[in-house]
Amino acid sequence: MQFMTVDLFDNERDGFTSVRIPALVALGGGKLLAFAVGRTQVSDWSESKILMRRSEDMGLTWSPARVVAEMAGSVVDNPVPIVDKERACIHLLYQTDYKRCFYTKSTDGGETFAPPADITATFEQYRPRYSWTVIAPGPGHSIVLRSGRLLVPVWMAAGIGKAHRPSCIATIYSDDGGATWQPGEIVHDNDDFLPNPSETVAVELSDGRVMLNIRNESSRYRRAVAYSPDGATRWTPVEFADALYEPICCAGLVRMGPDEGADAGVLVFTNPAGKPGEVPRSGKGMPRTNLTVRLSYDEGRTWPFSRSIEPELAGYSDVAAGDGFIYCLYEHGAGSDKPIHPRGIRLARFTVDWVKERE
C-alpha cells in the first residue's frame, strides 16, 4: 500500500478540548513513537500534558495513548524526541509554562522514561545576550549529529507577559548523551528582514553542516534557512528558501537514513502549502491548508517532487522515515470555530514513489 492514513489523536475521544503539536520518530524495525499535546483549552497557555502512542508494525496498529509528561496546573508542551541509536535510547525535551525546560530519556524503546531533569539553567545562560520571558524547544523531533552531539533548535521571546513576540532562535546541545546541555549561539533575532523567527527544524547535511529550516513572519511568506559547521556556532546569515512557502506554521524536515537504499540522503519536508487566491487570516498568517510533502535530492537547494497529503485544513506536522516508508504526523480538520485549532492528529504513511507519481 503506497498511501494510507490513520487517526491517532482526537480531541473528543481523548478527552481534551484540543490535541495539538505532533512529534514523530522512527526507531527502526517497524517501530514508531507518536507524541502530541493534550490541552484543557485551545490556548497555548492552557493546562496540558504530553501524550504518546507506539506502533510496532510500521504504523498499522497503535497502543493506546498514555501520558509521558505532566505537571498539575501547568502548561506541558513542545515535545522534542530524539532517536539515539548509538546510545540505544530516546531522548525527550519539553517545556513547562514557557519558562522551564526539562529533559528525560527512555532506554526501553519508549516503554518508560526516567524522572525528568530541569535544564532551564542552559537557557539562563542566554540572559546576558537575550532577556527572555518565554522559552520553548522545537517542537517536533530533533537529531543526533555524526559526532554524537544531541542538537535541539529552540526559540525564545522577550515580549511583555505571555507574548510570543518579539522572538529569536538558537540551538542547545549536549556532547555527553544528555547529561549536560550547553547554549549555542543565537542564530537570528527579530528584525525587519526576518521578523519573529520561532519554531525551527534541523537536519545534518552530507558534508556535516547543519541546516536550520525556520518559521518566520516575513511578508514574503517563505521559509528561511541558516547553516552551521557544528550546529551551535558560526551560523551563516539567514536567507529565504524561495521554493518553500511559509504560511507561518511549524513544519517537518527529515533526512532519509542510510538503510533506505536509493533514497538514502533524500530530504523530506512537510508543511501547509496553501491554495491559490488565499488571503491572510486575522493577523499575518495565511490559512493552514493543503499539507504537502516535498523531496530534495541536492541538500535542500531544490525541491523537484511534491504531492499533497491533506488538501483541506492541516497545520503543524512532523515527519520521519524508515522501513521503506515516509511517515507524516499532522494536525487535521477544525476542532472549533477557529480553523487554526485542529480536530485531531493524523498519521499518513507513503513511499517516495507515491510522492513522485504526483496526483
Which functions belong to the PLM regions below?
Residues 1-359:
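Asp-box/BNR beta-propeller blade signature and adjacent active/binding-site loops
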